[in-house]
Amino acid sequence: AVLTPEIDSITWKQPDELNLFVHTHDASNSTRYYRWEYEETWEYNSWFEATLDFKDGQIVSRPPEEQVFTCWRSDSSELINLGNTSALTQDVISYQPLTTITQASSFERNKLSVRYSILVKQLGLTKEAYNFWNILKKNTELTGTLFDPQPSRMPSNIKCTTDPGRESIGFISVGKITQQRIFIRHSAVPSWPLLDESQTCSKVTMNSIDAPAYLQNDPFYSPV
């Protein structure tokens, strides 16, 4: 098993987009090969605060436990993120890219609207396990253009015990996972743009007398 060193820090830079990085080192120079995964969780608010609800044909107050103004959402890494220091004198990883939060969509911009968190998991690999993940990355992520590498044969340390001639694909490795979490509040990135009303759901204004009849025909409350 590979003993994975602790993560030194997770940092970020924000010229326009927000780029996140991981930093680590092994003072014994024995790890050398690394893989990272991450889980994102962010808090955001709905544009309108719904203090009322429509139940059984009546408009009623929404109790605190049913508030829908504060929301949370999570996402996880999908791409294979690898690093190695085999060509370096010291086993030090600095500014290894993790992910980038862009301003291109409301989904991305919402991540930093209130508070954002990222949990980074780090795993030390053997050279053989690193080669497996590196080939898998090339075969699955770096394809589709004339200049991409050709798919390679996958290494494997799995064998079929009932049929030794049958090829098996996969790689088993054992190691310790180290992890670290950071939080970023919107106040730390004050220039980050927030959504405006034109990018949210439209508002319908009416008097309280007409509201029950309108909601009675709304597909959200009265699905067909």
Give the role of each language-model region.
Residues 1-224:
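A sequence/structural signal for flexible, mid-protein segments enriched
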